[in-house]
Amino acid sequence: NNSTIAGQIAAGNVNLCTTLVTIMHDLFVDSTFNSNIGFWDTSNVTSMNNLFKYARQFNQDIGGWDISKVTSFSATFMAANNFNQDISNWDTSSLTNMYSMFREAGDFNQDIGGWDTSNVSSMDSAFLSATDFNQDLTGWCVSNFSSEPSNFSNNALLTSTNKPLWGTCAPSVTLTDTDSNNIVTGSNVVTITATFDRSMAATPTINIIGEVSNVAMTASSTAAVWIY
């Protein structure tokens, strides 16, 4: 639990049942730790502030962690120079604080463009001096920010074309189709429906590799539902 996990780690034990842990602050700060902890149960953790701060050797797969309750990632990977693992599938819907999250994380350059940032209210210095990071963040929901946060990506590789579109929230879309078995023969006609979370002001286009490129979809009953 919260009162014993730090002591267990200090004693060299990481084979822990972490189900009761809700706070994971500072556990590996300024350490040489680099052991597998991808199996930890983080489903009840709400804060991971400074978790790997200055943990310059850590580079383990933690992409399977359930972080759906985590609200704060303040300085979680700050100066964790070696970390570059795929965490694209993390459920960040509860996240509110990304202050200095990847600050000085020199090697990190993973695709996190699909993260849900709709509840985030702090992104100051999130990628400050993250010298390798240059992923497309234009799909992030950043309606809580009227302008770029302070030092968001100063001295980082992130280009202006990959930065979030401040003050906007990209629409989400669900795709469904009429092909039940994923096998299409020459005589089959498959209908693909795109359902957006809001009405679209412009006509969406669809790309299917090897089949169609930027083909306009057809409006359905509302401007939020489109068909191809």
Where are these regions (language model features)?
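Negatively charged
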Residues: 1-170
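Non-catalytic beta-sheet/beta-sandwich ligand-binding modules that flank or precede catalytic cores
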Residues: 170-228
